[in-house]
Amino acid sequence: YLISSSKLRKARQNYQNVSPYFNRMRDTISRVVPHLPEEPEHPFFHERNLENPRRAYLVLTADKGMAGAYNQNLLKFLREHADPNDRFYVIGQVGYRALRHRDPRLVEEFRYSATAPTLQRARDITVDAIDDFKSGKLDEIYIVYTKIQNALTSEPVMERLLPLDRRFLQPAPKGLGDPKGEVELVPDAWTVFEQIAPIYMHGMIFGAMTESFCAEQSARMTAMDSATKSAKDMIHDLELEYNRSRQGSITQEITEIIGGAAAVQNNE
């Protein structure tokens, strides 16, 4: 429990450090998108093959177990939302082992660790995702991870990574005298978007990785706390049973001694 709580503090601090970066990237790209021309449409917004899309899920599980129902809930959520022809790109050894040889949708050559997420790991994953989307290998890419709802609860969620949705990339209403209200995009909106869109996506993946890792440590701490309490209760019950058995044995021995002494006296 103490080790889990220590890891949770570090993971939570890392998540809190990452959140402002991701929020700023979302704000930045939301201020660029309205300046993009409607035609031609940027490939990152292109929705294709709508009737039967080639869909992939980037699934963030843990590298280790003993975290309660953390991994089971995530995989159950994935199976409930996925179609038979979808593909699973799984981060984390637990999810990989759970699906390997059991689910043909798993992409076995895709293997990444979930422990101690790094920005470089998120970049590598983003490059692979963008390449598969641009080449037409995939039509839709979703990320499935565990989102922290509050200090005590978390739950699996699914967010679309590609294609991007303009509806969710709109700038917040400008406040009175807001110095960020107007932006000048140099050389043009398309070029700026080409540069920041991949950064936004790997920030999105990195944010999900750090949040999932934090949720994993929280689930493991809760599981270890529950296991510790259960062990203490078991020890208490065993001590009571031992004391009762010991007391019964002592009582039996005393009874036998008294009975033997009485028999000796009667014989005399």
Tell me what each language-model feature is.
Residues 1-268:
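C-terminal beta-strand-loop-alpha-helix "lid" module of Rossmann-like NAD(P)-dependent dehydrogenases
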